[in-house]
A protein has these predicted regions:
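Non-catalytic, usually N-terminal nucleic-acid engagement modules in DNA/RNA processing proteins
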Residues: 8-82
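Catalytic cores of enzyme domains
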Residues: 38-41, 69, 75-187
Length: 187
C-alpha cells in the first residue's frame, strides 16, 4: 500500500484513503507508525487515533475528576473502541490482519502495564511525545486527548515517529498537579 496504486485507470492512495476513513469514523488525529523494532508487537504497523477532550471539562478537573469527566471518559472510550473496531473491519475486509486494541481486549499485568500501550503506538505514529505528566502530548491538543490503537500487517505508509519530548523547560503540568505527584522527569 505504499504510495499511489493504479486501479481501474485511477491513481489511488490506500494510506490516505484509510486515514480519511478513520477520520470519517470520528478520529480527530490519525497516525501510522512502524512497530517492527517494538519487541512486544506481533504486527509491523500500528495506527494511533486520538479524540480531544472538551475544554470546559478540562477546566473543571483542577482538583479532582468530576462526574461529567467520568461520563465523558466512558463515552470517549466507547467512541474510540468503535473507531478502531471499524478500522479493523476496514483492513480485514481488504485481506490484511488487524487487531483493534479496545478496552475489552487489552490485558494488564499486576503493575497495570499493557503489552503494547496506546501511547507507545502514538509516539511511533508521530501523534506526539510523552510529557513530564507521563501522558501523550500532541501539538494540536496538548495532553487533553483520549487515545486508542489498532495493529496491522497492512503495508501502510508510516509517519515519522516522535522520539524526543518537546517539553523543554516547561514545567506547567508539574507546577499545577494538585497531588504534587509529578517529578519533572523527561521520558
Amino acid at each position: 500500500m505504499n504510495g499511489n496504486v493504479l486501479k481501474g485507470g485511477i491513481f489511488m492512495n490506500p494510506t490516505k484513503e484509510f486515514r480519511d476513513y478513520m477520520i470519517s469514523q470520528g478520529a480527530a488525529l490519525v497516525g501510522i507508525g512502524d512497530l517492527t523494532a517494538v519487541p512486544s508487537s506481533d504486527y509491523p504497523v500500528g495506527i494511533a487515533v486520538a479524540i480531544p477532550l472538551p475544554k470546559h471539562v478540562i477546566k473543571d478537573l483542577q482538583l479532582a475528576p468530576t462526574r461529567e469527566y467520568y461520563k465523558l471518559y466512558t463515552t470517549l472510550n466507547d467512541k474510540l473502541n468503535a473507531i478502531v473496531t471499524a478500522g479493523e473491519k476496514y483492513l480485514t475486509g481488504r485481506g490484511y490482519q488487524a487487531y483493534a486494541q479496545t478496552t475489552d481486549r487489552i490485558t494488564v499485568d499486576s503493575d497495570n502495564r499493557s503489552p503494547l500501550p496506546h501511547k507507545t503506538v502514538a509516539t511511533r505514529a508521530g501523534l506526539g511525545w510523552i510529557g513530564k505528566n507521563c501522558l501523550l502530548v500532541t501539538p494540536q491538543y496538548g495532553s487533553a486527548v483520549r487515545i486508542s490503537s489498532l495493529l496491522t500487517d497492512a503495508p501502510l505508509t508510516c509517519d515519522a515517529p516522535v522520539t524526543r519530548s518537546q517539553c523543554g523547560a516547561c514545567h506547567a503540568c508539574v507546577r499545577y498537579c494538585p497531588a504534587h505527584a509529578l517529578k519533572n522527569t523527561l521520558w
